[in-house]
A protein has these predicted regions:
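Terminal amphipathic alpha-helical/low-complexity segments used for targeting or macromolecular assembly
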Residues: 2-238, 408-476
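Generic, low-specificity signal for short hydrophobic/alpha-helical stretches with a mild N-terminal bias
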Residues: 38-41, 185, 189, 269, ...
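Generic detector of bulky aromatic hydrophobic side chains
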Residues: 18, 63-67, 214, 220, ...
């Protein structure tokens, strides 16, 4: 198990009876972030989700469970993401203060670590509830590795000061940077059973079991405050397996099936008939389920609009799948709109292994049940079909059938008319569509977001060039 190796006592433990705790936890990003594209074009790996909590929060909660108090959470990521990420995390930062959990969440503000002890954690590390309490046995001056990959390293004030220059460049850590961290440790421990995520489909593979495992953590000290209307049914278990947040409403004839796992429905969410939700399932705040078949392992973020059939899929906030269609074993980013009857495949006709293209590795076997990976701000037209294992780049528009990976900022219509077409989405169009979409949710687009979109447009030019995407107007 991940923290089993932390029980050796050759150096001082971080948490002891009457002792001190670390003053900060730092989630660092390494070069493997590219494996998770297009999802990580717009966020660090540690903000990806599986189960109820994102990866960074699983780490922070593990530290809390170990008895840490009044500590800071730091996210280290690419420089171009920092301004927008700080803005998005403002609510988390304010919420964190004074709660007895952590003092705040800070992005690339590593100067705050001067004079502090810190636990540096690889942002790809998956910490489960079973392992979290064992974090109390972490030892200062120790680096924890799996093979040749760094999982975590606990450093005192002086050692932390020595490694800060490696992180203050605002770029993912290189092998040389990681070696700088390792050199600051007085000893190393091999951890064989840790799970350091390498591919995006692993998030989906572990999602259902983590929703079940984290349900108790997410509902600890809380009672359901929502309304289960007369005629709504909890099937396969009792009400303790369902959590309804404040203002949540489940309408008559809706079925909540908890036979195989719990169901969490966040504050202000509404479930309309005819809907059947099978646990384990997580639905965030302010989301509407509008006549859907929400199958086991569904993980739907805040302020989404979801109908049709969803199975074993993860959706970030503000994404819409309002109409009929199927979404299976898929990972969907923020502000995505899937048009009516959009359907993805998650199983080959041959029942063979799905091969996903990973940057720097080529085709990688991902298992037999693999859907698609859809980046932020993607739009699909009515009747769009997406083949197994396809990656749909950020800000792209899909028409027809996607049998290949789709580059970012692309109007993709290769299956429509004649030889089809793939045309670059104009930057000005992307900015204006972004403004309109946010306005529909009564959110004002920020200058930081506009600058991020401009940067991403330039960073993804090579994707479009390699795929033969042309400039001009689409020929539909």
């Amino acid at each position: 198990m991940l923290f089993d190796a932390f029980t050796q006592k050759r150096s001082r433990k971080i948490t002891e009876e009457g002792g001190r705790t670390m003053q900060a936890v730092v989630l660092f990003e390494d070069g493997r972030w590219t494996n998770f594209k297009p999802l990580t074009w717009t966020r660090p790996v540690c903000l990806l989700r599986t189960g109820i909590f994102p990866l960074w929060e699983k780490v922070a909660r593990a530290c809390q469970a170990a008895g840490w108090q009044d500590f800071e959470v730091h996210i280290h990521t690419r420089r171009y993401l920092a301004p927008t990420l700080r803005h998005c995390l403002t609510g988390i930062r304010d919420k964190g203060r004074g709660t007895g959990r952590w003092k705040g969440v800070f992005v690339n503000e590593l100067e705050r670590l001067e004079g502090k002890s810190a636990l540096f954690v690889n942002g790809r590390l998956l910490v489960t509830p079973e392992l979290a309490p064992q974090a109390s046995a972490l030892e200062e001056g120790t680096a924890y590795l799996k093979g040749n990959e760094l999982l975590a390293i606990a450093l005192g004030e002086r050692a932390t000061a020595k490694v800060l220059p490696a992180l203050q460049k605002g770029e993912p850590l290189t092998d040389a940077d990681l070696q700088t961290l390792l050199d600051a440790a007085s000893r190393r421990v091999e951890v064989t059973d840790a799970l350091l995520l390498r591919y995006p489909w692993q998030l989906i593979d572990h999602n259902a079991e983590l929703i079940s495992a984290e349900f108790a953590l997410a509902t600890a000290g809380k009672e359901s405050e929502g309304k289960l209307e007369q005629g709504a049914v909890i099937y396969g278990g009792d009400a303790s397996r369902v959590y309804l947040g404040k203002g949540a409403i489940v309408h008559p004839t809706v079925v909540l099936d908890v036979t195989h796992g719990p169901i969490y429905i966040g504050d202000g969410s509404i479930v309309y008939p005819p809907t059947r939700i099978e646990g384990p399932a997580y639905i965030g705040k302010g989301t509407w389920i509008v006549g859907g078949k929400i199958r086991e392992g569904s993980n739907i973020g805040d302020v989404c609009r979801v109908g049709g059939e969803v199975e074993e899929s993860i959706l970030h906030g503000y994404s819409n799948k309002y109409h009929d269609g199927f979404l299976g074993h898929a990972y969907v980013g923020e502000w995505v709109n899937l048009g009516a009857l959009t359907t993805n495949s998650d199983l080959k006709d041959t029942y063979g292994s799905v091969r996903v293209t990973v940057e720097g590795e080529g085709k990688v076997d991902a298992g037999t049940k693999v859907g698609c990976f859809i980046g932020d701000h993607v739009k699909t037209s009515i009747g769009t079909l997406i083949y197994t294992g396809k990656r749909i780049g950020i800000f792209s528009h899909l028409h027809g059938v996607a049998t290949d990976d789709v580059p970012s900022f692309t109007i993709w219509a290769k299956s429509i008319g004649g030889q089809g077409d793939a045309v670059e989405l104009l930057l000005d169009s992307a900015l204006e569509i972004h403004r309109r979409v946010l306005a529909r949710r009564k959110i004002e687009a920020t200058p930081e977001e506009a600058e991020l979109i401009r940067t991403l447009f330039e960073l993804t030019r090579e994707e479009r060039s390699k795929a033969g995407v042309r400039q001009g107007r689409p020929q539909l």
